[in-house]
Each structure stands twice: as C-alpha cells, then as structure tokens.
C-alpha cells in the first residue's frame, strides 16, 4: 500500500512539474514586448539568477532605462555581443542608477547562454 502511495505521489509531482514547465515556456514565447520596448541582454550566473547587461539601451528610436536599484553587470553591449556562449567569465556586479550600471566593486562568474539574440 505504501509503495502504491509513493508511486501515485511521484506521478502527481511529475505531472505538476511538466505542466509548470509548459506554462513557463508558453509565457516566454507569448510575451509581447510591445512596439516601444526591447528585451535587455542578460547573463546567467551560478545561482541561476540572470542579471541584465547594463541599464540603458536604444530601442526603436528612443531610450530605455531599467529601474534604479536593479541588479546588473557592468558589461557593455558590444562586449556581450562578442562573448562565447556557455563560457564562464568573471563579471563585475553593479546596480542601476539613472540608467547607469554603477560598479559595486564585486565580481561573480557569469556566462552568455546558447541561442541569445544579438
């Protein structure tokens, strides 16, 4: 009886994880940035909490800034463009203030993912 209960619980857990993963994928694919916003480039880290590259970018003829206090990497977009995907780099940590990623004088390992758009 305990074995059947464990199997049933495992099946429910797998089903829940599968549904959750499907919802996440659909949300990412269906997200509409609108006509006046563009996605910021990001870098992954070993804690699986991606951070933005810089705090400001040109988008559809205008400027786009991240909110003050947002975590970021002090890395220029042109450097991000040249980074080798899946290769670890030592990246300076920063915090957005008035559209600038201000250096916190700390570093962490980061990497560009596969399939990142340029």
Swiss-Prot record:
Keywords of the record: Disulfide bond, Glycoprotein, Secreted, Signal
Disulfide bonds: 38-59, 55-96, 72-101, 91-110
A GO-annotated cellular component: extracellular region
Signal peptide segment: 1-21
Residues carrying covalently attached carbohydrate according to the record: 45
Domain of life where this protein originates: Eukaryota
Main location: secreted
Single GO molecular function: C-C chemokine binding
This protein's record includes keyword Secreted: yes
Subcellular localization, as worded in the UniProt entry: Secreted
Function statement: Salivary chemokine-binding protein which binds to host chemokines CCL1, CCL3, CCL4, CCL8, CCL17, CCL18 and CCL22.
Name this protein carries in UniProt: Evasin P974
Organism: Amblyomma cajennense
Organism lineage: Eukaryota, Metazoa, Ecdysozoa, Arthropoda, Chelicerata
């Amino acid at each position: 009886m305990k074995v059947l209960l464990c199997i049933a619980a495992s099946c429910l857990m797998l089903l829940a994880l599968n549904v959750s993963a499907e919802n996440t994928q659909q949300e990412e694919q269906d997200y509409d940035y609108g006509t006046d916003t563009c996605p910021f480039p990001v870098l992954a880290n070993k804690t699986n909490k991606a951070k933005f590259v810089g705090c400001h970018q040109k988008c559809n003829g205008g400027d786009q800034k991240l909110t003050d206090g947002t975590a970021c990497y002090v890395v220029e977009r042109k450097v991000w463009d040249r980074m080798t995907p899946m290769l670890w780099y030592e990246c300076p940590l920063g915090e957005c203030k008035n559209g600038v990623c201000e250096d916190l004088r700390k570093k962490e390992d980061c990497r560009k993912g596969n399939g990142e758009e340029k």
